[in-house]
Protein backbone atom coordinates (compact mmCIF):
# COMPACT_ATOMS: atom_id res chain seq x y z
CA UNK A 1 0.00 0.00 0.00
CA UNK A 2 2.81 2.39 0.78
CA UNK A 3 4.37 1.85 -2.61
CA UNK A 4 1.07 2.49 -4.40
CA UNK A 5 0.48 5.76 -2.49
CA UNK A 6 3.95 7.05 -3.23
CA UNK A 7 3.55 6.20 -6.90
CA UNK A 8 0.23 8.06 -7.03
CA UNK A 9 1.78 11.14 -5.44
CA UNK A 10 4.64 11.13 -7.93
CA UNK A 11 2.23 10.87 -10.88
CA UNK A 12 0.09 13.72 -9.50
CA UNK A 13 3.14 15.97 -9.13
CA UNK A 14 4.22 15.22 -12.69
CA UNK A 15 0.74 16.07 -14.00
CA UNK A 16 0.68 19.38 -12.15
CA UNK A 17 4.15 20.30 -13.42
CA UNK A 18 3.14 19.51 -16.99
CA UNK A 19 -0.03 21.62 -16.73
CA UNK A 20 1.90 24.54 -15.22
CA UNK A 21 4.50 24.50 -18.00
CA UNK A 22 1.79 24.61 -20.71
CA UNK A 23 0.12 27.60 -19.01
CA UNK A 24 3.43 29.44 -18.80
CA UNK A 25 4.06 28.98 -22.49
CA UNK A 26 0.66 30.45 -23.31
CA UNK A 27 1.26 33.44 -21.08
CA UNK A 28 4.66 34.13 -22.58
CA UNK A 29 3.20 33.95 -26.07
CA UNK A 30 0.54 36.45 -25.11
CA UNK A 31 3.07 38.74 -23.51
CA UNK A 32 5.23 38.77 -26.60
CA UNK A 33 2.56 38.96 -29.26
CA UNK A 34 -0.19 41.14 -27.88
CA UNK A 35 1.59 44.57 -27.85
CA UNK A 36 2.93 44.02 -31.34
CA UNK A 37 -0.46 42.83 -32.56
CA UNK A 38 -2.17 45.85 -30.99
CA UNK A 39 0.28 48.39 -32.43
CA UNK A 40 -0.16 46.84 -35.86
CA UNK A 41 -3.91 47.30 -35.70
CA UNK A 42 -3.64 50.84 -34.38
CA UNK A 43 -1.21 51.79 -37.11
CA UNK A 44 -3.58 50.45 -39.75
CA UNK A 45 -6.60 52.30 -38.36
CA UNK A 46 -4.69 55.56 -38.07
CA UNK A 47 -4.86 56.27 -34.36
CA UNK A 48 -1.97 58.15 -32.84
CA UNK A 49 -2.77 57.43 -29.22
CA UNK A 50 -2.33 59.19 -26.97
CA UNK A 51 -1.94 62.40 -29.04
CA UNK A 52 0.00 65.40 -27.80
CA UNK A 53 -2.75 67.86 -26.74
CA UNK A 54 -0.76 71.14 -26.86
CA UNK A 55 0.57 70.64 -30.41
CA UNK A 56 -2.68 69.24 -31.79
CA UNK A 57 -4.83 72.14 -30.46
CA UNK A 58 -2.33 74.73 -31.51
CA UNK A 59 -2.40 73.52 -35.05
CA UNK A 60 -6.19 73.32 -35.15
CA UNK A 61 -6.73 76.91 -34.08
CA UNK A 62 -6.99 79.34 -36.99
CA UNK A 63 -4.01 81.67 -36.72
CA UNK A 64 -3.36 84.24 -39.38
CA UNK A 65 0.16 84.87 -38.11
CA UNK A 66 2.80 82.50 -36.85
CA UNK A 67 5.20 83.22 -34.09
CA UNK A 68 8.85 82.26 -34.19
CA UNK A 69 8.35 80.78 -30.72
CA UNK A 70 5.61 78.38 -31.81
CA UNK A 71 6.51 74.68 -32.07
CA UNK A 72 7.67 73.55 -35.52
CA UNK A 73 5.00 72.71 -38.03
CA UNK A 74 4.63 69.24 -39.46
CA UNK A 75 4.12 68.45 -43.07
CA UNK A 76 1.09 66.37 -44.08
CA UNK A 77 -0.33 66.32 -40.57
CA UNK A 78 -4.07 65.70 -40.58
CA UNK A 79 -6.63 64.01 -38.43
CA UNK A 80 -7.50 60.49 -39.65
CA UNK A 81 -11.10 59.56 -38.94
CA UNK A 82 -11.90 55.94 -37.90
CA UNK A 83 -14.28 53.95 -40.09
CA UNK A 84 -17.85 54.94 -39.54
CA UNK A 85 -19.17 51.37 -39.52
CA UNK A 86 -18.27 49.32 -36.43
CA UNK A 87 -18.65 46.12 -38.42
CA UNK A 88 -15.51 46.87 -40.41
CA UNK A 89 -13.06 46.46 -37.52
CA UNK A 90 -14.81 44.83 -34.54
CA UNK A 91 -11.62 43.20 -33.26
CA UNK A 92 -9.61 46.44 -33.38
CA UNK A 93 -12.16 48.48 -31.44
CA UNK A 94 -12.42 45.82 -28.75
CA UNK A 95 -8.67 45.64 -28.31
CA UNK A 96 -8.41 49.50 -28.31
CA UNK A 97 -10.91 49.69 -25.44
CA UNK A 98 -9.09 46.93 -23.61
CA UNK A 99 -5.84 48.84 -23.98
CA UNK A 100 -7.35 52.03 -22.56
CA UNK A 101 -9.24 50.34 -19.71
CA UNK A 102 -8.29 46.77 -18.71
CA UNK A 103 -11.52 46.40 -16.75
CA UNK A 104 -13.68 46.80 -19.83
CA UNK A 105 -14.53 43.82 -22.02
CA UNK A 106 -12.50 41.09 -20.29
CA UNK A 107 -12.54 38.17 -22.72
CA UNK A 108 -10.42 35.61 -20.87
CA UNK A 109 -11.05 35.51 -17.10
CA UNK A 110 -8.21 33.03 -16.67
CA UNK A 111 -5.68 35.51 -18.09
CA UNK A 112 -3.03 36.15 -15.42
CA UNK A 113 -3.20 39.58 -13.89
CA UNK A 114 0.50 40.24 -14.34
CA UNK A 115 -0.08 40.56 -18.11
CA UNK A 116 -1.99 43.78 -17.69
CA UNK A 117 0.80 45.86 -16.11
CA UNK A 118 3.06 44.80 -18.95
CA UNK A 119 0.56 46.25 -21.40
CA UNK A 120 0.58 49.57 -19.52
CA UNK A 121 4.36 49.68 -19.55
CA UNK A 122 4.52 49.67 -23.33
CA UNK A 123 5.44 53.18 -24.62
CA UNK A 124 2.70 54.96 -26.58
CA UNK A 125 3.01 55.02 -30.36
CA UNK A 126 4.99 57.99 -31.57
CA UNK A 127 4.23 60.42 -34.36
CA UNK A 128 3.54 58.61 -37.65
CA UNK A 129 6.40 58.36 -40.09
CA UNK A 130 4.63 60.58 -42.62
CA UNK A 131 5.04 63.61 -40.33
CA UNK A 132 8.39 65.19 -41.15
CA UNK A 133 9.62 68.06 -39.03
CA UNK A 134 10.41 71.13 -41.09
CA UNK A 135 11.67 74.56 -40.18
CA UNK A 136 10.75 76.97 -42.99
CA UNK A 137 11.04 80.74 -42.81
CA UNK A 138 8.23 82.64 -41.12
CA UNK A 139 6.72 83.75 -44.40
CA UNK A 140 6.74 80.18 -45.73
CA UNK A 141 5.11 78.95 -42.54
CA UNK A 142 2.27 81.40 -43.02
CA UNK A 143 1.73 80.10 -46.55
CA UNK A 144 1.68 76.48 -45.32
CA UNK A 145 -0.81 77.25 -42.55
CA UNK A 146 -3.08 79.25 -44.83
CA UNK A 147 -3.05 76.62 -47.60
CA UNK A 148 -3.68 73.82 -45.09
CA UNK A 149 -6.67 75.72 -43.67
CA UNK A 150 -8.12 76.24 -47.12
CA UNK A 151 -7.68 72.59 -48.20
CA UNK A 152 -8.65 70.62 -45.11
CA UNK A 153 -10.79 72.94 -42.92
CA UNK A 154 -10.32 71.05 -39.65
CA UNK A 155 -13.21 71.08 -37.20
CA UNK A 156 -13.34 74.10 -34.93
CA UNK A 157 -12.94 73.85 -31.19
CA UNK A 158 -15.90 73.74 -28.87
CA UNK A 159 -17.57 77.14 -28.78
CA UNK A 160 -15.37 78.52 -31.54
CA UNK A 161 -17.09 79.75 -34.67
CA UNK A 162 -15.47 79.61 -38.08
CA UNK A 163 -13.89 82.89 -39.21
CA UNK A 164 -16.20 85.20 -41.07
CA UNK A 165 -15.34 86.44 -44.54
CA UNK A 166 -13.25 89.60 -44.44
CA UNK A 167 -15.12 92.71 -45.48
CA UNK A 168 -13.99 96.28 -45.88
CA UNK A 169 -13.70 97.99 -42.54
CA UNK A 170 -12.25 101.51 -42.33
CA UNK A 171 -10.92 100.79 -38.86
CA UNK A 172 -8.78 97.94 -40.23
CA UNK A 173 -7.37 99.81 -43.20
CA UNK A 174 -6.88 103.27 -41.74
CA UNK A 175 -3.42 104.62 -41.08
CA UNK A 176 -2.69 104.74 -37.41
CA UNK A 177 0.06 104.40 -34.88
CA UNK A 178 -0.61 101.13 -33.12
CA UNK A 179 0.91 99.62 -30.05
CA UNK A 180 1.26 95.89 -29.91
CA UNK A 181 2.19 93.93 -33.03
CA UNK A 182 4.77 95.77 -35.14
CA UNK A 183 6.11 94.66 -38.48
CA UNK A 184 8.96 95.63 -40.73
CA UNK A 185 7.29 98.77 -42.09
CA UNK A 186 4.76 101.43 -41.20
CA UNK A 187 1.42 101.79 -42.91
CA UNK A 188 1.98 103.69 -46.13
CA UNK A 189 5.73 103.17 -46.34
CA UNK A 190 7.35 103.54 -48.73
CA UNK A 191 5.15 106.36 -50.01
CA UNK A 192 4.00 106.38 -53.60
CA UNK A 193 6.06 108.27 -56.13
CA UNK A 194 4.33 111.50 -57.22
CA UNK A 195 2.91 111.48 -60.72
CA UNK A 196 0.20 113.30 -62.68
CA UNK A 197 -2.20 110.52 -61.65
CA UNK A 198 -1.86 110.97 -57.89
CA UNK A 199 -0.98 114.68 -57.70
CA UNK A 200 -4.57 115.71 -57.03
CA UNK A 201 -4.88 113.20 -54.21
CA UNK A 202 -1.56 114.28 -52.68
CA UNK A 203 -2.68 117.91 -52.51
CA UNK A 204 -6.24 117.13 -51.42
CA UNK A 205 -6.90 119.32 -48.35
CA UNK A 206 -9.01 116.63 -46.68
CA UNK A 207 -6.26 114.01 -46.94
CA UNK A 208 -5.10 113.24 -43.42
CA UNK A 209 -1.81 111.75 -42.35
CA UNK A 210 -0.24 110.55 -39.13
CA UNK A 211 2.54 112.53 -37.47
CA UNK A 212 4.93 109.90 -36.13
CA UNK A 213 6.96 110.24 -32.96
CA UNK A 214 7.58 108.64 -29.55
CA UNK A 215 3.86 108.91 -28.75
CA UNK A 216 2.84 106.32 -31.36
CA UNK A 217 6.02 104.32 -32.13
CA UNK A 218 7.87 101.71 -30.03
CA UNK A 219 11.01 103.04 -28.41
CA UNK A 220 12.99 99.81 -28.10
CA UNK A 221 13.90 97.32 -30.78
CA UNK A 222 12.19 99.09 -33.69
CA UNK A 223 14.51 101.90 -34.69
CA UNK A 224 13.79 101.21 -38.37
CA UNK A 225 10.18 102.29 -37.80
CA UNK A 226 11.36 105.58 -36.31
CA UNK A 227 13.44 106.25 -39.42
CA UNK A 228 10.45 105.47 -41.61
CA UNK A 229 8.24 107.76 -39.54
CA UNK A 230 10.75 110.60 -39.78
CA UNK A 231 10.84 110.18 -43.56
CA UNK A 232 7.04 110.30 -43.77
CA UNK A 233 6.91 113.40 -41.54
CA UNK A 234 9.48 115.18 -43.70
CA UNK A 235 7.63 114.15 -46.85
CA UNK A 236 4.28 115.52 -45.67
CA UNK A 237 5.89 118.80 -44.63
CA UNK A 238 7.30 119.20 -48.12
CA UNK A 239 3.99 118.24 -49.70
CA UNK A 240 2.23 121.01 -47.76
CA UNK A 241 4.71 123.53 -49.12
CA UNK A 242 4.49 122.28 -52.71
CA UNK A 243 0.71 122.17 -52.82
CA UNK A 244 0.57 125.95 -52.37
CA UNK A 245 1.86 126.33 -55.94
CA UNK A 246 -0.90 127.52 -58.23
CA UNK A 247 0.40 125.75 -61.34
CA UNK A 248 -0.01 121.97 -61.56
CA UNK A 249 3.31 121.72 -63.38
CA UNK A 250 5.13 123.52 -60.60
CA UNK A 251 3.33 121.40 -58.01
CA UNK A 252 4.36 118.16 -59.68
CA UNK A 253 7.99 119.19 -60.03
CA UNK A 254 8.05 120.29 -56.42
CA UNK A 255 6.51 117.12 -54.94
CA UNK A 256 8.81 114.94 -57.06
CA UNK A 257 11.88 116.66 -55.64
CA UNK A 258 10.47 116.42 -52.11
CA UNK A 259 9.81 112.68 -52.52
CA UNK A 260 13.27 111.97 -53.93
CA UNK A 261 14.92 114.02 -51.19
CA UNK A 262 12.93 112.22 -48.47
CA UNK A 263 13.87 108.79 -49.83
CA UNK A 264 17.53 109.81 -50.15
CA UNK A 265 17.67 111.06 -46.56
CA UNK A 266 15.92 107.91 -45.40
CA UNK A 267 18.62 105.75 -46.99
CA UNK A 268 21.34 107.91 -45.44
CA UNK A 269 19.75 107.29 -42.05
CA UNK A 270 19.53 103.55 -42.81
CA UNK A 271 23.26 103.33 -43.58
CA UNK A 272 24.16 105.32 -40.46
CA UNK A 273 23.29 102.39 -38.17
CA UNK A 274 24.76 98.90 -38.00
CA UNK A 275 21.63 97.08 -39.11
CA UNK A 276 20.46 95.70 -42.41
CA UNK A 277 19.22 98.62 -44.53
CA UNK A 278 16.05 98.71 -46.59
CA UNK A 279 16.41 96.59 -49.70
CA UNK A 280 15.82 99.59 -52.00
CA UNK A 281 18.60 101.56 -50.32
CA UNK A 282 21.15 99.05 -51.61
CA UNK A 283 20.58 100.43 -55.10
CA UNK A 284 21.49 103.84 -56.47
CA UNK A 285 20.00 106.59 -58.58
CA UNK A 286 16.91 105.85 -60.61
CA UNK A 287 17.04 102.17 -59.72
CA UNK A 288 16.60 103.07 -56.05
CA UNK A 289 13.62 105.35 -56.78
CA UNK A 290 12.03 102.71 -59.04
CA UNK A 291 12.43 100.15 -56.26
CA UNK A 292 10.63 102.39 -53.77
CA UNK A 293 7.94 103.02 -56.37
CA UNK A 294 7.33 99.29 -56.79
CA UNK A 295 7.34 98.64 -53.04
CA UNK A 296 4.77 101.39 -52.27
CA UNK A 297 1.63 99.77 -50.80
CA UNK A 298 -0.61 102.71 -51.78
CA UNK A 299 0.86 104.51 -54.79
CA UNK A 300 -2.41 106.37 -55.41
CA UNK A 301 -2.55 107.79 -51.83
CA UNK A 302 -6.19 106.67 -51.60
CA UNK A 303 -6.14 105.93 -47.90
CA UNK A 304 -9.16 105.98 -45.64
CA UNK A 305 -8.04 107.92 -42.58
CA UNK A 306 -8.81 106.81 -39.08
CA UNK A 307 -11.76 108.59 -37.49
CA UNK A 308 -10.55 111.44 -35.30
CA UNK A 309 -12.21 111.27 -31.91
CA UNK A 310 -12.17 114.81 -30.66
CA UNK A 311 -14.64 117.06 -28.98
CA UNK A 312 -16.12 119.49 -31.45
CA UNK A 313 -16.97 123.04 -30.55
CA UNK A 314 -20.67 123.02 -29.74
CA UNK A 315 -23.07 125.40 -31.31
CA UNK A 316 -26.78 126.04 -31.29
CA UNK A 317 -29.18 126.35 -28.40
CA UNK A 318 -28.48 123.09 -26.60
CA UNK A 319 -28.17 123.55 -22.86
CA UNK A 320 -25.45 121.40 -21.24
CA UNK A 321 -27.78 119.88 -18.66
CA UNK A 322 -27.41 117.93 -16.45
CA UNK A 323 -23.87 118.89 -15.47
CA UNK A 324 -21.27 116.16 -15.08
CA UNK A 325 -20.43 114.62 -11.74
CA UNK A 326 -17.30 116.29 -10.30
CA UNK A 327 -14.42 113.84 -10.00
CA UNK A 328 -10.70 114.17 -9.27
CA UNK A 329 -10.12 113.80 -13.02
CA UNK A 330 -12.35 116.64 -14.22
CA UNK A 331 -12.03 119.10 -11.33
CA UNK A 332 -9.14 120.79 -13.16
CA UNK A 333 -11.38 121.51 -16.14
CA UNK A 334 -14.13 122.68 -13.81
CA UNK A 335 -11.87 125.34 -12.33
CA UNK A 336 -9.53 126.31 -15.18
CA UNK A 337 -12.22 126.45 -17.86
CA UNK A 338 -14.94 127.90 -15.65
CA UNK A 339 -14.69 131.41 -17.07
CA UNK A 340 -14.70 130.05 -20.60
CA UNK A 341 -17.98 128.20 -20.19
CA UNK A 342 -20.74 130.15 -21.83
CA UNK A 343 -24.51 129.77 -21.73
CA UNK A 344 -26.23 129.51 -25.11
CA UNK A 345 -28.27 132.55 -26.07
CA UNK A 346 -31.76 132.73 -27.55
CA UNK A 347 -32.97 129.77 -25.52
CA UNK A 348 -36.70 128.95 -25.65
CA UNK A 349 -38.51 130.74 -22.83
CA UNK A 350 -40.00 127.60 -21.34
CA UNK A 351 -40.26 126.96 -17.64
CA UNK A 352 -38.34 123.67 -17.83
CA UNK A 353 -35.35 125.26 -19.58
CA UNK A 354 -35.39 128.23 -17.24
CA UNK A 355 -35.21 125.91 -14.22
CA UNK A 356 -32.24 124.10 -15.76
CA UNK A 357 -30.55 127.42 -16.56
CA UNK A 358 -31.11 128.59 -13.00
CA UNK A 359 -29.53 125.39 -11.65
CA UNK A 360 -26.48 125.77 -13.91
CA UNK A 361 -26.00 129.41 -12.91
CA UNK A 362 -26.21 128.53 -9.23
CA UNK A 363 -23.78 125.64 -9.67
CA UNK A 364 -21.19 127.83 -11.42
CA UNK A 365 -21.34 130.24 -8.48
CA UNK A 366 -20.65 127.39 -6.07
CA UNK A 367 -17.85 126.10 -8.29
CA UNK A 368 -16.19 129.51 -8.09
CA UNK A 369 -16.17 129.29 -4.31
CA UNK A 370 -14.74 125.75 -4.36
CA UNK A 371 -12.02 126.59 -6.88
CA UNK A 372 -10.76 129.37 -4.64
CA UNK A 373 -10.01 126.64 -2.09
CA UNK A 374 -7.48 125.03 -4.40
CA UNK A 375 -9.54 122.86 -6.76
CA UNK A 376 -11.40 121.25 -3.86
CA UNK A 377 -13.01 118.12 -5.28
CA UNK A 378 -15.11 117.40 -2.18
CA UNK A 379 -16.52 120.91 -2.26
CA UNK A 380 -17.45 120.72 -5.95
CA UNK A 381 -19.12 117.34 -5.49
CA UNK A 382 -21.20 118.60 -2.54
CA UNK A 383 -22.20 121.71 -4.50
CA UNK A 384 -23.23 119.56 -7.47
CA UNK A 385 -25.35 117.27 -5.31
CA UNK A 386 -27.08 120.12 -3.41
CA UNK A 387 -27.78 122.05 -6.62
CA UNK A 388 -29.45 119.10 -8.33
CA UNK A 389 -31.46 118.25 -5.21
CA UNK A 390 -32.76 121.82 -5.19
CA UNK A 391 -33.54 121.54 -8.90
CA UNK A 392 -35.61 118.39 -8.26
CA UNK A 393 -37.47 120.13 -5.43
CA UNK A 394 -38.58 122.82 -7.87
CA UNK A 395 -39.41 120.23 -10.53
CA UNK A 396 -41.59 118.20 -8.18
CA UNK A 397 -43.36 121.31 -6.85
CA UNK A 398 -44.99 121.88 -10.24
CA UNK A 399 -47.78 119.66 -11.57
CA UNK A 400 -46.00 118.80 -14.80
CA UNK A 401 -43.72 116.01 -15.95
CA UNK A 402 -40.55 116.38 -13.86
CA UNK A 403 -37.09 115.36 -14.98
CA UNK A 404 -36.72 111.58 -15.11
CA UNK A 405 -33.93 111.55 -12.51
CA UNK A 406 -36.10 113.47 -10.05
CA UNK A 407 -38.35 110.43 -9.66
CA UNK A 408 -35.62 109.00 -7.44
CA UNK A 409 -35.47 110.27 -3.87
CA UNK A 410 -32.29 112.08 -2.78
CA UNK A 411 -29.93 109.12 -2.93
CA UNK A 412 -26.94 107.73 -4.82
CA UNK A 413 -29.43 106.42 -7.40
CA UNK A 414 -30.44 109.98 -8.28
CA UNK A 415 -26.81 111.08 -8.49
CA UNK A 416 -25.98 108.16 -10.75
CA UNK A 417 -28.92 109.00 -13.01
CA UNK A 418 -27.83 112.61 -13.48
CA UNK A 419 -24.19 111.60 -14.00
CA UNK A 420 -25.19 109.07 -16.65
CA UNK A 421 -27.22 111.64 -18.62
CA UNK A 422 -24.58 114.41 -18.52
CA UNK A 423 -23.72 115.37 -22.13
CA UNK A 424 -20.26 116.70 -21.17
CA UNK A 425 -19.03 114.74 -18.14
CA UNK A 426 -15.50 116.15 -18.49
CA UNK A 427 -16.67 119.78 -18.71
CA UNK A 428 -15.00 120.14 -22.11
CA UNK A 429 -18.03 121.33 -24.06
CA UNK A 430 -16.28 124.37 -25.52
CA UNK A 431 -12.82 122.82 -25.80
CA UNK A 432 -11.37 121.61 -29.09
CA UNK A 433 -7.92 120.16 -29.75
CA UNK A 434 -6.63 120.98 -33.22
CA UNK A 435 -3.55 119.97 -35.21
CA UNK A 436 -1.64 122.92 -36.66
CA UNK A 437 0.93 120.70 -38.36
CA UNK A 438 -1.28 120.54 -41.46
CA UNK A 439 -3.37 123.62 -42.25
CA UNK A 440 -6.66 122.59 -43.89
CA UNK A 441 -9.86 124.50 -44.76
CA UNK A 442 -11.61 122.80 -41.86
CA UNK A 443 -8.88 123.96 -39.47
CA UNK A 444 -9.12 127.54 -40.73
CA UNK A 445 -12.88 127.40 -40.23
CA UNK A 446 -12.28 126.70 -36.53
CA UNK A 447 -9.50 129.28 -36.18
CA UNK A 448 -11.53 132.02 -37.85
CA UNK A 449 -14.31 131.58 -35.29
CA UNK A 450 -14.42 133.50 -32.05
CA UNK A 451 -12.11 131.49 -29.82
CA UNK A 452 -9.18 131.60 -27.47
CA UNK A 453 -6.03 129.49 -27.46
CA UNK A 454 -4.84 127.43 -24.53
CA UNK A 455 -1.25 126.29 -25.01
CA UNK A 456 1.76 125.52 -22.86
CA UNK A 457 3.95 127.13 -25.55
CA UNK A 458 4.05 130.90 -25.26
CA UNK A 459 4.36 131.65 -28.98
CA UNK A 460 1.38 129.63 -30.26
CA UNK A 461 -1.27 132.35 -29.67
CA UNK A 462 0.81 134.81 -31.70
CA UNK A 463 1.00 132.33 -34.56
CA UNK A 464 -2.75 131.81 -34.59
CA UNK A 465 -3.37 135.56 -34.48
CA UNK A 466 -1.22 136.02 -37.60
CA UNK A 467 -3.08 133.23 -39.36
CA UNK A 468 -6.53 134.58 -38.50
CA UNK A 469 -5.92 138.31 -39.00
CA UNK A 470 -4.32 137.94 -42.43
CA UNK A 471 -6.18 134.93 -43.82
CA UNK A 472 -9.76 134.85 -42.51
CA UNK A 473 -10.82 137.74 -44.77
CA UNK A 474 -9.76 135.84 -47.90
CA UNK A 475 -12.10 133.61 -49.91
CA UNK A 476 -12.62 130.21 -48.33
CA UNK A 477 -10.50 128.20 -50.85
CA UNK A 478 -7.48 130.47 -50.28
CA UNK A 479 -7.55 130.48 -46.48
CA UNK A 480 -5.63 127.22 -46.03
CA UNK A 481 -2.79 128.24 -48.37
CA UNK A 482 -2.54 131.59 -46.62
CA UNK A 483 -2.49 129.93 -43.21
CA UNK A 484 0.33 127.59 -44.23
CA UNK A 485 2.39 130.51 -45.54
CA UNK A 486 1.87 132.46 -42.32
CA UNK A 487 2.90 129.44 -40.28
CA UNK A 488 6.17 129.01 -42.17
CA UNK A 489 6.89 132.74 -41.97
CA UNK A 490 6.26 132.66 -38.22
CA UNK A 491 8.65 129.71 -37.79
CA UNK A 492 11.32 131.54 -39.77
CA UNK A 493 10.86 134.60 -37.56
CA UNK A 494 11.09 132.55 -34.34
CA UNK A 495 14.36 130.98 -35.45
CA UNK A 496 15.69 134.29 -36.81
CA UNK A 497 15.32 137.71 -35.16
CA UNK A 498 13.37 136.32 -32.18
CA UNK A 499 15.64 133.37 -31.54
CA UNK A 500 16.70 134.58 -28.08
CA UNK A 501 13.17 135.44 -26.91
CA UNK A 502 12.13 131.85 -26.19
CA UNK A 503 13.53 128.46 -25.27
CA UNK A 504 13.64 125.72 -27.89
CA UNK A 505 13.68 122.40 -25.98
CA UNK A 506 13.34 120.38 -29.21
CA UNK A 507 16.27 122.30 -30.82
CA UNK A 508 14.27 122.91 -33.98
CA UNK A 509 16.06 126.16 -34.76
CA UNK A 510 19.39 124.36 -34.93
CA UNK A 511 18.19 122.51 -38.04
CA UNK A 512 18.58 123.88 -41.53
CA UNK A 513 15.75 126.24 -42.52
CA UNK A 514 13.08 124.69 -44.70
CA UNK A 515 11.27 121.39 -44.51
CA UNK A 516 13.41 119.92 -41.72
CA UNK A 517 12.85 122.90 -39.47
CA UNK A 518 9.13 123.08 -40.22
CA UNK A 519 8.78 119.35 -39.64
CA UNK A 520 10.41 119.72 -36.22
CA UNK A 521 7.91 122.44 -35.25
CA UNK A 522 5.00 120.36 -36.54
CA UNK A 523 6.09 117.33 -34.56
CA UNK A 524 7.00 118.97 -31.25
CA UNK A 525 4.99 122.19 -30.92
CA UNK A 526 2.01 122.28 -33.28
CA UNK A 527 0.39 118.86 -33.02
CA UNK A 528 -2.10 119.46 -30.20
CA UNK A 529 -3.37 122.97 -29.55
CA UNK A 530 -6.48 123.59 -27.46
CA UNK A 531 -9.08 126.11 -28.59
CA UNK A 532 -11.90 127.50 -26.49
CA UNK A 533 -15.06 128.79 -28.15
CA UNK A 534 -17.21 131.68 -27.06
CA UNK A 535 -16.73 135.31 -26.25
CA UNK A 536 -13.92 135.21 -23.72
CA UNK A 537 -12.71 138.74 -24.00
CA UNK A 538 -13.48 139.48 -20.35
CA UNK A 539 -11.87 136.34 -19.00
CA UNK A 540 -9.12 137.08 -16.54
CA UNK A 541 -7.30 135.35 -13.81
CA UNK A 542 -6.75 131.99 -15.51
CA UNK A 543 -3.20 132.50 -16.58
CA UNK A 544 -0.92 134.80 -18.42
CA UNK A 545 -2.64 137.01 -20.97
CA UNK A 546 -0.50 137.33 -24.07
CA UNK A 547 -0.49 140.31 -26.39
CA UNK A 548 -2.59 138.35 -28.87
CA UNK A 549 -5.39 137.67 -26.47
CA UNK A 550 -4.21 134.13 -25.93
CA UNK A 551 -4.03 132.58 -22.52
CA UNK A 552 -1.27 130.38 -21.23
CA UNK A 553 -2.22 128.15 -18.33
CA UNK A 554 0.83 128.14 -16.12
CA UNK A 555 4.36 129.06 -17.15
CA UNK A 556 5.39 127.84 -20.55
CA UNK A 557 8.32 125.46 -20.50
CA UNK A 558 9.48 126.88 -23.80
CA UNK A 559 9.42 130.51 -22.71
CA UNK A 560 12.06 132.51 -20.93
CA UNK A 561 10.67 133.96 -17.73
CA UNK A 562 12.25 137.19 -16.57
Swiss-Prot record:
InterPro entries: ECM1, Serum_albumin-like
Region (Disordered): 46-87, 119-171, 539-562
Keyword Oxidoreductase: no
Sequence repeat intervals: 172-301, 305-427
Compositionally skewed regions (Gly residues) per UniProt: 543-552
GO cellular component, one term: collagen-containing extracellular matrix
Positions of glycan attachment: 376, 466, 538
Keyword Secreted in annotation: yes
Spans annotated as 2 X approximate repeats: 172-427
Residues spanning the signal sequence: 1-19
Pfam families per record: ECM1 (PF05782)
GO MF entries: interleukin-2 receptor binding; protease binding
Domain of life the protein comes from: Eukaryota
Start-end of Basic and acidic residues biased regions: 129-154
Broad class of the protein's primary localization: secreted
Protein task: Involved in endochondral bone formation as negative regulator of bone mineralization. Stimulates the proliferation of endothelial cells and promotes angiogenesis. Inhibits MMP9 proteolytic activity.
Assembly and binders: Interacts (via C-terminus) with HSPG2 (via C-terminus). Interacts with EFEMP1/FBLN3 and LAMB3. Interacts with MMP9.
Protein name as annotated: Extracellular matrix protein 1
Species annotation: Rattus norvegicus (Rat)
